[in-house]
Each structure stands twice: as structure tokens, then as C-alpha cells.
From Swiss-Prot:
Protein name as it appears in the record: Phenylalanine--tRNA ligase beta subunit
Main location: cytoplasm
Gene Ontology, cellular component aspect: phenylalanine-tRNA ligase complex
Residues reported in the UniProt entry to bind Mg(2+): 360, 366, 369-370
GO biological process, one term: phenylalanyl-tRNA aminoacylation
UniProt key word Magnesium: yes
Pfam family, one: tRNA_synthFbeta
Catalytic function, reaction form: tRNA(Phe) + L-phenylalanine + ATP = L-phenylalanyl-tRNA(Phe) + AMP + diphosphate + H(+)
Provenance organism: Methanopyrus kandleri (strain AV19 / DSM 6324 / JCM 9639 / NBRC 100938)
E.C. designation(s): 6.1.1.20
Amino acid sequence: MPVVTIHYDKLVKILGREVSFEELAHNLIPMLGSDVERIDEREMVIETEFFPNRPDLYSVEGVARALKGFLGIETGIPEYNVRRSDVEARVEESVLDARPCLAVAVVRGVEFEDERDLEHLMEFQEHLHWVIGRDRKKAAIGIHDFEAVEPPLRYFLADPNDRSWAFEPLDHPGEEMTPAEVLRRHEKGRQYAHLVSDGAPILADEEGVISFPPVINSERTRVTQDTTDLLIDVTGTDWRSVLDALHVIVCNLAERGAEILTVEILGAYERTTPTMELDVWDVPVSEARKLLGIDLSGEQLEELLERARHGAIFVPEGERELREYPLPDVYHIEADWREIPPILYEEDVVRVFVGPRRTNILHEWDLIEDAGIMYNYDRFEPTVPDFYTPSRADREREFINVVRDTLARMKFVEVNSLTLISPEENYRKMRLEPDGRAVKLANPIQKEYTIVRTWILPSLMRFLADNKHRPYPQRVFELGEVIERDEDAETGAKDRWKLALAIAGPGVGFSEIKSVVEALLRELDVTGWEITERKHRSFINGRCAAVLADGRELGFFGEIHPEVLTEFDLEVPVVGGEFDVAALRTAAGW
């Protein structure tokens, strides 16, 4: 999890109130849901770890904003000064198949008092890269000195070897490089080359290249201590991640009094960024009482949510005329706000307006958690239940842990992938036809995740494809759930635990995966098993086998078919297999 460096003098200045270093380090900051890693009383520095669901707290400005609410210094949605700029950015069709999403903002009036402020900004940027951007894959942030930028901007896909798009990358002044040379010679280029495919995404102004996302910015637009105005660009492959990253960073910079200016995105699509939209939620007072275990009134819940830096208004059950309650006028920007939804609960509720910096509010319970934090967990009175139940480890989980430990001793690395997948990867790329067993999502958000996986091996193939830049051989496994349709089940589907394993690298073959499977069966004390030939379209014919015990198939393994390797753009042989955990457990006598 990200570790945030907080200098006491910086925090107190933004906070606007004297608070002792000891109180901050030992009481207040931990109350925000963080784990203090290091306290340096001589340098007056606190290093604290925040959960990945709160990127808005990854800088001293975000921590100060939260503490203002906790201490009652300032409550409600922060008031930011937002207006339109005359800056435009044009997106060309060429980039849509590579890195299609672009969001841009200008932030004026930023003050860097000393080198620490610059270091904080860079640290904040990298934390967002890791948590929201998934190490720049989904979103990458570029921060520029706006005075060095000559709008309008142009975002397009260039030939990596075209010298007309050569530029001086950061930390290499005087060394003009093409995008291809950056990928070969620059340390950041080598680190992120795997995110760049055939062409090079380029963000340019009238003077030339200002950024080669997601790799490196131009030295020309370097931010220094004298910089007062910033241009912030966020590019990526996922719109939500891109907008979340932009909103979090501009809102935190605005905590120092900076002004946010929007930018018009034109060309392949049109939108104004940042959008600064609010989300609207209704929190039933009864639900908050039940989850927190305290007797809260509607007015008290409203106050707690305001202290959590949300907009909140208590709406009693009999006052439904407030269902058209307007959005708070806290963002000074002309915008077409979406229609405010009616209140659906037939009980007392608190209507909550959530600012765009809070990327983690996915359910009303998230808001109730915020209320609990503001109430102060130290005030909760623990109670001892008047009953107890003896516990023991679940036998299935015990067996799964034995399998996990056994494979770890065999030098395999465990992978945890999503249970959602696309039919493309679950079937076609594995040379299979859809069989109607997959559970489909009614309202998928992304085309990559429209069904629940029916087996795990495709997920491992995707993992190997994403890690081609890592050294070989690669030995990975996953223990996880798969779900299949079952008309006889109460829910219409059944879930099962599966084990999948794969080895990738030059020279791997059937004998290597066979020896691994045999060793695993011996370690699990499976008896009476035999290996027989099996046909499976994902494997090379004649190089696939099944493991049987008492006439029941435990799983299968073999050499992955070359067509499957091609579909996943893999250039080395892969062997793998998949086993039913319940069948393995039965055969092992658990």
C-alpha cells in the first residue's frame, strides 16, 4: 500500500490550526484509517500507509482536507474555484486503438515553497500511477509547466522511428531521441516499453512533443520550484481510471487555493475535463444505526457525513417535497448536471452529494463507514457476546492451503486474477466453441468482462502474455473459483474451486508438466491414480493427458497448442493443466 510522507509544518499550514506533532502522529492521522509506519520527531516527519481505496489521501493536501472535517474546522464539500479555459486538445483517430482516453486540466496559482513540495507532488503522482493507473497501464499522469506549453494540444499515434517527433526526454537535456530511442535508451522507456505497441502515443503542442505517454514527459515542460501554473494530462485505456486520476490530483492541488481550469477535448470525441460531477446517494438512517450499532438521529448522521467532506441533508420520511433538492453550488463552473434522482426509500434518509475526488464510494455502506470514522472509533463501546461457537478450520480451505504450499515449494508463484472474463478469452482464444455453460453479466461495464469464467487456464495465459518482458522460465498457478450454469441449482448456477498451473519458457515440454503433476499427486497422498491420453482443443493433439482416480477425472494437462500461443502473442512454449479441487480432495482422502 502507498506510504505517504507528511511534513509537520506543511500539514499544519494547510490545516490552519496548531496541532501538536504527537497528537497528529499518534491519534489524528491513525483515526483516518491509516497505519503509521515511521515517526521522525527530529525531522518532524510522519510516514503513514493508507489503504488503496483512498487515493485522495495520498498527499499532505488530502490529509489536511480530511482532518479539517474530523476536527470540525471545515465541513461539507470543499469549495473549489473552477472555470473554463481557452485551451483545446484534439484527439486523432489514430490513437483510439492504442491508448484512447485523454483528459486534461490546467491548474493556476500553485505555490512550491521549497524542494519538498515538488517531491510531494512527484510522490503523489507515482502513488496514483500505482493504485488508480495499475502501474500506468490504465492511466498515466503527465505534469507540465504550463508557461512552457503552446496550445492547442494534439494527441495522436506516431511512427516511433519518425525523427520529426524526436524530443528531449526528462533527465536527458540535450539528448534528442525518437520515441523508439526512448524505449531503448531511457530508463523509463525500458521500464514501460511493454505498454507501447506498434505506434507511439504522442501529446504535442505548437512547439513539438510535450509527452510520450505512458513513458516520459519532455524536458522542455519540466516543473520547477518557480512553476506557478500546471498543465496536467492523463492518458489511458479506461475512462473511469483516467477521470478518477485527474479529479483526485486537481482537487488536492486546489486545497492550497489553486484555481482549476477545464480543457475542451475535441476530434475523435468531445468532452470537457475535468467534469467535476457529483454523485448522489441516499443513506437510510436505520441502516446506519444497524451497521454502526449506535443510536444516531438523522441530524447526527447528516453532521457526520458533512464532517467527512460530503454534502448532506437529512430528509425525514414525511418531507418528500425535498426529493428535487438541488445540487450544492460549490463548483464554480457552468455544467449540465444530470437530473437529480428521486428518493426511493420510504423512511428517514440522508441525501449525500459526493465529490469527484472520492473514487471509492460504490455503495451506501461506504458512506456509513465514513460516518463511523468521523464519529471516532475510540468512542465505540465494545461488548462481549453472550454466546460463543467453537470454531475449526474449514476442511476444504485446509486442503487448498496444502495444495498452495506444495506448489510454492515446487517454485511456482501464485496468481490471483479476476473471475470475470470475456468470451473471447474463455473460448475462442483457447480454440473452443461457447458451450452455454458461462454465466453472462446483465450489465457489463467493459467488454473485457462480460461473463464469469468457466475455467482458470485462460486467465493464466493472459497473465503470461502480460509478463512477456519478465525473465523465463515462468512457473505460475492459481487456486480460484469458477462458475457454471446449472438449471437444477437454487441460484441457477454452481461454483467450484479449480487449480490451474502453467510453465512458460524455452524448451518446456510435456515431460516437465507431467513430472510436476506426478509430484503434486504424491505430495497430496492421492492413491490409485493413472494417466491416460486425452483430447482437448487447447492442447497439442497427442500431448494432452488426463489424470483418473477410481474412474473419475481429476484434471488434465499437456502442451498448449501453438494457435493458442499465437492468440495470446506468446513466443515461447507453454505447458499447463487444470484440476478440480473437490475431486483432488476426495482422491486424497480429505
